[in-house]
Amino acid sequence: MLSILIPTYNDDCYELVQALTLQAKALNLADWEIIVADDGSTDGQVIARNKNLQDIPGCRFVRNNDNMGRAAIRNFLVEQARGKYLIFIDADMKICEPNYLKRYVMAQALGNVVYGGYIVQGGTKTNLRFLYEKQGEKNRSAQLRNNQPYKDFHTSNFMVSRKVMKDLPFDERFRHYGYEDVFWGKQLEVYGESIVHIDNPVAFCTFEQNSDFIVKTEEGLRTLRLFRNELKGYSPLLKVADKLERNKLKPLFACIFRVMGKRLKRLLLSKHTNLLAFQIYKLGYYLSLK
């Protein structure tokens, strides 16, 4: 049996589930299921829309009133699932490959963890999230990802055996945004479980406003700071920050950020937003954390 698992928080999953249902039916799989788990969404319209998923054959919608956290909601989905293989897809992704499910079914022979990647569609040059994702697109081919299989892994689109997920669940200390997937990739390497990268992308085409992305980024940086010891070697920003600290330059950079941080943030929120300013802001924000 194949289980398709979608954690959601304030994301409308209806079109995503419809696309997956059509592919599952076309494959004539012996048994399959789609489970959508709402992690305490607050948008009433989205909740109402997602409740209609229960009317789609093969789909189940589970609503949690409280927010469990990004790691815990995925572990919850594993407990709800019945499949031998599990496909995780983020709720804000879009199916862009007509043979998406077929490719994953065929890839089951390759390994217990298979990551399909993602592509970027739409967006504008004034949107910071779009610029950020678009910049990294050239490095997202399966060939390049396989060079660093554990460091180029994300939970937005992957297949995993039930056995691996039961043996290595997501670390539920990661309640807030960021790095739960990075740490899980590290755990796979520690325990000698291979990650196979293939070209089977979903599309990332929904980009939050610059202000929301900055808030999310700051939350991720606080997560990185909290788990900095566990994530050493798995974050380029952490590597730079540690080097500055070893050279006793952290106080200087933190001081500069206190003076320039608000100005940088205003730039990032404007139509002149750019990635160089974003990288400087991220480093400065991280170094200013206690």
How does the language model describe each region?
Residues 94, 98-129:
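Conserved donor NDP-sugar-binding/catalytic core segment of glycosyltransferases
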Residues 64-81:
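Glycine-rich, basic loop-to-helix element that forms the pyrophosphate-binding segment
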Residues 20-63:
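Acidic donor-binding segment of Leloir-type glycosyltransferases
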Residues 176-184:
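Acidic donor-binding loop at a coil-to-helix junction in glycosyltransferase catalytic cores
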Residues 86:
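Short aromatic/hydrophobic "clamp" motif used to bind/position activated sugar donors
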Residues 140-160, 176:
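A recurrent flexible, glycine/aromatic-enriched loop bordering the glycosyltransferase active site
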Residues 219-222, 236-290:
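Non-catalytic, C-terminal membrane-associated alpha-helical segments of glycosyltransferases
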